[in-house]
C-alpha cells in the first residue's frame, strides 16, 4: 500500500505521499509519484491502492471536475456514484484524497465522499501512523501544513513496512 497525508492550515492545503510500490511482499519501486495536480493546478490529489486503478480514477475524476467547472464536491460525488455503480469501475481498488481551496475529501469505491472534521486526511497502510503524528503536530505546534505533512510521512515511513521515506508533496495556497 502506501501513505497519503493531507493537512490544511493557515491558508495552505498540502497533500503528500510516499513513493513505495509493492507487489506482494516485494518492493518494486521506491520513487513513485502518488500525488499530483489536476484541473489547471487548482486541485491536488493523492491515491492509496493499486497504481493502475488510481491512474484510471485520476482520469475519471479530472473529467468530472471539467464537467462541473472545478466544483470539487460535486465532482467527487459524481465519481463516487460511478465508481459504486459501474460494473467495471467497482473492481478498482484505491482510495483518493483530494483537496482544493475550499474542501479536503476522501473518495472511496463504496460510494463514500467524506470531509473530515479537522481537514486532516491520512489513507493507506501507513495512514494511522501519519494521522497520529499529524494530529499531535497540529495540536501542539505552530508548524505549517507542509512541515506537518513531511514529518508525518517520515514517521509513517519509519513504522510501516509498506511506506518509504521518498516523498512527493503538492501544496495549494488560498
From Swiss-Prot:
Catalytic activity: ATP-dependent cleavage of peptide bonds with broad specificity
EC number: 3.4.25.2
Family: Belongs to the peptidase T1B family. HslV subfamily.
A GO term for molecular function: threonine-type endopeptidase activity
Any one Pfam family match given in the protein's UniProt record, by short name: Proteasome
Subunit record text: A double ring-shaped homohexamer of HslV is capped on each side by a ring-shaped HslU homohexamer. The assembly of the HslU/HslV complex is dependent on binding of ATP.
Enzyme class of the recorded protein, top EC level: hydrolase
Active-site residues annotated for this sequence: 2
Alphabetized PROSITE patterns for the sequence: PROTEASOME_BETA_2
Disulfide bonds listed in the record: none
Top-rank taxon, per record: Bacteria
GO biological processes: proteolysis involved in protein catabolic process
Activity regulation, per record: Allosterically activated by HslU binding.
Binding positions (Na(+)): 157, 160, 163
Entry GO terms, CC: HslUV protease complex; proteasome core complex
Protein name as it appears in the record: ATP-dependent protease subunit HslV
Organism: Yersinia enterocolitica serotype O:8 / biotype 1B (strain NCTC 13174 / 8081)
Keyword tags: Allosteric enzyme, Cytoplasm, Hydrolase, Metal-binding, Protease, Sodium, Stress response, Threonine protease
Listed CDD domains: protease_HslV (cd01913)
SUPFAM superfamilies: N-terminal nucleophile aminohydrolases (Ntn hydrolases)
Known role: Protease subunit of a proteasome-like degradation complex believed to be a general protein degrading machinery.
Subcellular location as annotated: Cytoplasm
Amino acid at each position: 500500500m502506501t501513505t497519503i497525508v493531507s493537512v490544511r492550515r493557515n491558508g495552505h492545503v498540502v497533500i503528500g505521499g510516499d513513493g513505495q510500490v509493492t507487489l506482494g511482499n516485494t518492493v518494486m519501486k521506491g520513487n513513485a509519484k502518488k500525488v499530483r495536480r489536476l484541473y489547471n493546478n487548482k486541485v491536488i490529489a493523492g491515491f492509496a491502492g493499486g497504481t493502475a486503478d488510481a491512474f484510471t480514477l485520476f482520469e475519471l475524476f479530472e473529467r468530472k471536475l471539467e464537467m462541473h467547472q472545478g466544483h470539487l464536491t460535486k465532482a467527487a460525488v459524481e465519481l463516487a456514484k460511478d465508481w459504486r455503480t459501474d460494473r467495471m469501475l467497482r473492481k478498482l481498488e484505491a482510495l483518493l484524497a483530494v483537496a482544493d481551496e475550499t474542501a479536503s475529501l476522501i473518495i472511496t469505491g463504496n460510494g463514500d465522499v467524506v470531509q473530515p472534521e479537522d481537514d486532516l486526511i491520512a489513507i493507506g497502510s501507513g495512514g494511522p501512523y501519519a494521522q497520529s503524528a499529524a494530529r499531535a503536530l497540529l495540536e501542539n505546534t505552530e508548524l505549517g501544513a507542509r512541515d506537518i505533512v513531511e514529518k508525518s510521512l517520515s514517521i509513517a515511513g519509519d513504522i510501516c513496512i509498506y511506506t518509504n521515506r521518498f516523498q512527493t508533496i503538492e501544496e495549494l495556497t488560498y
